[in-house]
């Protein structure tokens, strides 16, 4: 059975230097060399082929499975769901359109049934109309009869008046003619009697002739009257005048008998009274008979005109077949095109949206595939870099690896971006956390689902609003056309019944109209008017004949004839014209019904049909509740979209809530907690135990005056004045020194820490390392002053202050370099009091003034220093050029036993630097110059403090060996060569935090990266690890007690460097600040 071979370690061919020895220990551990770096050649050996090897599965997903899973990425799932919703809405819209058309047809069928009822409406309208028509017609017949009777009565009176006028005129004419003539004759006889006798003969003959003529006239008149009275069977006889012989007149005078005869004739003329009575009877009898006949006729006609002669429409239109036929007629061509057009527009809108969503889905999937490939490549390169760094540094950080695996792209590209927008490491760390929070799959899925869904629904609503506006604009014309169609069809359905009814009614009215014209007006016109006209004409003819017979041939004929025409002839002529007009217009025209008598008017039909048409296609007024089935269709589609938009809006609101929560967390951890605690006056509890602000009895702005401030280091380095005891440590508990390469450091640059190029060698920059150390020590008072005044260069504490608490050892320094890292309570600097309550500006100003004033020793301090110098004595324990021992005060100079000084007012005193570097143990059995153990060994060996002599302020000790303090930098041995950095062309840093910002100046940070070579007065790292030691007169051995290699420098360089340090100006002067 063969076991799979473990895959060989992959070697990047770009990192192989051809023609160079193999990288084996110890060369692989060295990064510093006096020679320049060996250049890379373009030659790269080919990598071994792996085509024949079988690649087994890994416990992680490779690129192909990741690309396969992008089909169901959280970015694509919302689009797939949205497409499914669009398809479902499209199908539901089509089905809804079909159901709405069915609803319209059903409504039309209901309208047909209603129209069938409307079709029967003429029957009931005809019945009511018949009643009113009968009543009106009967009243008209009675009124016409009454009018005729009144007219006949009037005509009768007028005819009587005319006949009486004619009669009286005739009698007056006769009276005038006969009596006048007789009067003339009588007068003439009397005249003739007085005349000559001879003329009597002629007179007698004339008289006889005249009498004969008069007899003829009378007889003629009587004959004419008798012709008139024959109508009433009346005959008038007038005797004739006898013609006398008048023989006696011959030769006789006129006798009186002639005159008497004339007078008798005159008195015997007729008066025509009988004629008047006969004329009245002739006229009155026919008129009375005519009035009676008209009256009876009108009553009989009015009574016979009733509902029996008028027909009404039948109820046969209520049958089912008629309703079905009417439904087919009304609904066969009903306009439902607007519903179809709207459904097609919605379907087209949904199809376009679905197509665009599919296209967008494909594009996003392609982008996700490219993104996944890029993320996989970046993660693979990052893992390779992390593996190389772990192999080189021997450290690991699993949480950094988690961040890389979760968000490799953020880890790769966020460092540069965050470095531009945020200068504080804590802010960059918080922003990196915020980006990881937002890039979590849950947040991403929620964002993409809500955002894509909301935008797609909103775009559809915008298009739907345009479609809705178009549908509303065309609704008015559709409603008008539908209403006109329905009105026309409804009127056509009722027109037949109305036509039948109107025809039957008009026929009945025509029959009665004929009866009225023939029976009422016909008898009167034919009987009365014509007869009366004939009678008048005949009467006037007879009168003329009588006048002609009486006065014809006489001088009175023409005047009498003219007189008769004026009085009687013109009246008879006008009466004839009147009777002729009555005969021509003696008829009536009764009103008839039109064919649409039973149809509703257009306004009424519109009132009936408009709500039905509006229910089918909408009223077109744009109202929310009156859009008809088209509005229902659009509202259904719109309501479904609005519900989905609300759902996606809620999801987007949830994502915004999560965004605000994450932003609040970032703000809270970026200074919000400290500001909140400061406002409440409560100290922040976020600092680690033992690193919070101390409970000091002095004001906070005077804290730097205590014996724990690095200002005393500068004074001790410039003016050495003996020793005073440090604070008593009653009990000591060993504090483990943690690994200086702590990978979980919050202020670490990235998941791997790129070293500075100067840190590769044991000394870095040979000419400037000590200078930078001294600059860092001199900058410490300025830093403290800025902290004191409430201003600080950075709010980030150094890793040496926060993460590397060293074990306290005995020292005679006023301020030990281990004090900042002590696990015991200490006065907190401004960097550790960021969350404490800020002082008022008055306190700040007063503290700053007092702090500047305290930079310089007071007069009492200078006098005390002078007295101390005079009190010093030389002993054999002294060394160096001065041979001045330390001024001792029993119980105060040495640490040990139970001697603890009482609390004193903080005053500046001069002390030496840390005595652990080089000191002389006077009471040790192992010799004058015993070897001082490291701190860890001193703590484990029950180290007892021993008195030592302080050394002068000389950088060149007199011993060839001495105590070496372990380095507190990120590497155990500052002289050990570090592995080479990764090539720049392979990858860039995945950092999201820029280079570490300490609370000290820029020079102090640079010194911390160069093996920890700093000034003894610096409180951050150890200077003594690289302290030069005298070996011979011309050489100085450096780093004797280190495990790594060693190096030497010329003594002249050391002396020159020390001389530069001595000649350096006051660190508190302006020149020094300009030099920085």
UniProtKB/Swiss-Prot annotation:
Compositional bias segments (type: Polar residues): 874-886
Transmembrane regions: 67-87, 139-159, 351-371, 433-455, 647-667
Compartments, as annotated in UniProt: Cell membrane
Keyword Zinc in record: no
GO cellular component: mating projection tip; plasma membrane
Region Disordered, annotated ranges: 1-31, 796-835, 874-908, 949-1020, 1057-1076
Composition skew (Basic and acidic residues), residue ranges: 997-1010
Stored InterPro entries: PRM1 (IPR026777)
GO biological process, one term: plasma membrane fusion involved in cytogamy
Function (record text): Involved in cell fusion during mating by stabilizing the plasma membrane fusion event.
Family label: Belongs to the PRM1 family.
PANTHER family the record matches: PLASMA MEMBRANE FUSION PROTEIN PRM1
Protein known as: Plasma membrane fusion protein PRM1
Species in which this protein is naturally found: Cryptococcus neoformans var. neoformans serotype D (strain B-3501A) (Filobasidiella neoformans)
Name of the encoding gene: PRM1
